[in-house]
Amino acid sequence: MTSLRRKARIAALQTLYEIDCTEHKAEDAVIHSTTEQSLSQEAISFTEKLVQGVLKNKSKIDEVIGRFAPSFPVAQMSVIDRNILRVAIFEILMDNTPVKVAINEAIELAKIFGSDSSPRLINGVLGSIVTKYGKASHKRPKEGKWQPSLKN
């Protein structure tokens, strides 16, 4: 059985994919993806939180991706991989999701929706971010304490 939060993450990924590939408004894309999956109100709220959080912080998140995946420019990365990373990085940096959960969920989404190499890419990028900033304790950094610099 798929958890409520996994279903919400799937809907968020589908929403972000739709927004990335079309000119659709975020609100319309959220309605489309959550209606398709018949999500509960709690799952819809979590989906909206993820989508809004990623969109609000997209440029900062994309800078982090670029820093830790220099061989894979964000614009050239597959739409699925790019948005899986965006959701996971949002959850790690700006949400209450434990680091281990965010990474595991991202890898599972990569296995379901990505290519054969997606889980390895996702794990490598997220693992590098966590290792660089010493957050391997699998706990979210305290508010305002973890603002990754894009410098070495």
Protein language model regions, located:
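N-terminal interaction/assembly modules
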Residues: 1-119, 123-152
